[in-house]
Amino acid sequence: MGLPWYRVHTVVLNDPGRLLAVHIMHTALVSGWAGSMALYELAVFDPSDPVLDPMWRQGMFVIPFMTRLGITDSWGGWSISGGTVTNPGIWSYEGVAGAHIVFSGLCFLAAIWHWVYWDLEIFSDERTGKPSLDLPKIFGIHLFLAGVACFGFGAFHVTGLYGPGIWVSDPYGLTGKVQAVNPAWGAEGFDPFVPGGIASHHIAAGTLGILAGLFHLSVRPPQRLYKGLRMGNIETVLSSSIAAVFFAAFVVAGTMWYGSATTPIELFGPTRYQWDQGYFQQEIYRRVSNGLAENLSLSEAWSKIPEKLAFYDYIGNNPAKGGLFRAGSMDNGDGIAVGWLGHPVFRDKEGRELFVRRMPTFFETFPVVLVDEEGIVRADVPFRRAESKYSVEQVGVTVEFYGGELNGVSYSDPATVKKYARRSQLGEIFELDRATLKSDGVFRSSPRGWFTFGHATFALLFFFGHIWHGARTLFRDVFAGIDPDLDAQVEFGTFQKVGDPTTRKQAV
C-alpha cells in the first residue's frame, strides 16, 4: 500500500475488528514489558541492606510500584524489610511478574485471533451492513467497568477488606510497611500526604464512574451534541483518550516530584525539596536536642539517630543532583553506602561550635564556609591563601565525631579537618564503596527523577497529540473539502469545487 510511517494507523480506521486486535497486542506488549522488567530487576536487586542500599539507590523502577501495592516477599526467601520468609505464595514479586508474562501471552494469542477473524457480526451495523461501532454505548460500558475497578481498589484492596492494603510510612520514611488504610472522609482526605485519601478518593471516584457509566448506557447524546463533538468518529475517541492520558501523566509527574502518600520516600527516595528545606536535618537536630534534654551526652544523643534518617540527609540522595545523560543508578554514581561515619562537630580555638554551609541543589561546587550559631562567618577554606583571614589553620578549627563509626574520634590536623568540612557540605558523612560497581563519583538521579522526567515529557508530547487529533476530527470537513453530513448526492467531476453548484464546469 506504500503508506508513510506516520499514516500507517489508517489501516484500522474503518475496521473495528482489527482496531481491537492492535489494542490487545499493545496490552500484550505493555504487560510483557512489565513482567520482564520485574524479572530483570529481581535478578540484579540486592535485598541485603534495606537501610543503606534500598531499592531506589539501586535504580529499581517497577519493584517500588509492586511494593507500594502490597507485595513485599520474594521466592528467593527475602522480604523487602530485610527479614526472611518461608512461603511467600503466589502474591510475591516473582508471582506477579509471572502473571504479567502469562497475561501477555494470552493477549498475544487473542490479538492474532482478532486480526484473523476481524469481520465479526457484532461490528457491523444491521441497517447498513457496514462496519460501525456505537461509540457512546462503548464509552458507557468502559466508564462503568473503570468505575467498578476504581471502587473495588479503594473499598477492598486499600482498606484491607479483601487485599493487603498499601505501603504506609511516617513523615520521615523510617517505619514503612504494608498495612490496611481506613478511608479519610474529612478535610484531611484532601491532604496529598494522608494515605486515607487514597481509599476515600477511589471509593468516591469509582461510585461517580459507575453512576456516569450507567447514565451513558441509558441516555443517548442529543443529536446536535453528537454531531458537534463528532461522536461518531473514532478519531474523537483517540483525541479524548490522549487527553485523559496526558492529564494523568501531568498529575503523577507532580505527585512524584513534589512527593505524596502515593510515592513513599522508602520506595522512591527522598524529594529534592527535603534537601532544600533541611527537612531531615531539622528532625535530626530535634531528636538530638530532646536527647540532651533527657541528660544524655552528646555522643549518646547522636548515637540514637537511626542510620536510615541520617542517610536521607545526604545530598547524594537528592533526585535533582542527577544530570542529563547520566544513566544508571545512584549506586553507579557516588557508590554503595557502607556506613555512617557519624556527625562531625567543628569548633574554633575559642570553643565556638561551627556549622558548615550546605551545598544548594543546583551547585556542582561550593565554597567551604563555616559559620557560628548566629550565622557569622568564622572559618573557610580560602581560594587564595595569601589573602586569607579565616583559614582552618589560622582559626585553629578542630572536628569531633558523635555517633556512627567514628564516635568519639577527634582531629586537629588541618588537612583532615578540611577534608571533613568539604564532605559536610554534602550533608551527613558516609563511607561509600566505589570499587564494587566501578562507580565514577558523579551523582545520579533516583527513580523519582526518571519517572518525573519521563511522564512530564510524554505528557507534553501527548498534549500536542490531543490538539492534533482533536483538530483533525472537529475540522475534518474543512480539511477534506467535503461536508461529512452532506445529504445531497454529489456527482464528482461536475463541479470544480466538490458540491459547490456555483463552480459548474463548462461543457467542452
Swiss-Prot record:
List the Pfam families hit by this protein, alphabetically: PSII (PF00421)
UniProt name for this protein: Photosystem II CP47 reaction center protein
> Source species, please?
Agrostis stolonifera
Keyword Translocase among record annotations: no
A Gene Ontology biological process in which this protein takes part is: photosynthetic electron transport in photosystem II
Q: Name one GO molecular function term.
A: electron transporter, transferring electrons within the cyclic electron transport pathway of photosynthesis activity
Q: Which domain of life is it from?
A: Eukaryota
Q: Does the record's keyword annotation contain Plastid? A: yes
* Family recorded in the similarity comment: Belongs to the PsbB/PsbC family. PsbB subfamily.
**GO CC terms on record?**
chloroplast thylakoid membrane; photosystem II
Subunit info here reads:
PSII is composed of 1 copy each of membrane proteins PsbA, PsbB, PsbC, PsbD, PsbE, PsbF, PsbH, PsbI, PsbJ, PsbK, PsbL, PsbM, PsbT, PsbX, PsbY, PsbZ, Psb30/Ycf12, at least 3 peripheral proteins of the oxygen-evolving complex and a large number of cofactors. It forms dimeric complexes.
Question: Per the annotation, how and in what number is the cofactor bound?
Answer: Binds multiple chlorophylls. PSII binds additional chlorophylls, carotenoids and specific lipids.
Keyword vocabulary terms for this entry: Chlorophyll, Chloroplast, Chromophore, Membrane, Photosynthesis, Photosystem II, Plastid, Thylakoid, Transmembrane, Transmembrane helix
Its record classes its membrane topology as:
Multi-pass membrane protein
Cellular compartment(s): Plastid, Chloroplast thylakoid membrane
Q: Where are the transmembrane segments?
A: 21-36, 101-115, 140-156, 203-218, 237-252, 457-472
Its biological purpose: One of the components of the core complex of photosystem II (PSII). It binds chlorophyll and helps catalyze the primary light-induced photochemical processes of PSII. PSII is a light-driven water:plastoquinone oxidoreductase, using light energy to abstract electrons from H(2)O, generating O(2) and a proton gradient subsequently used for ATP formation.
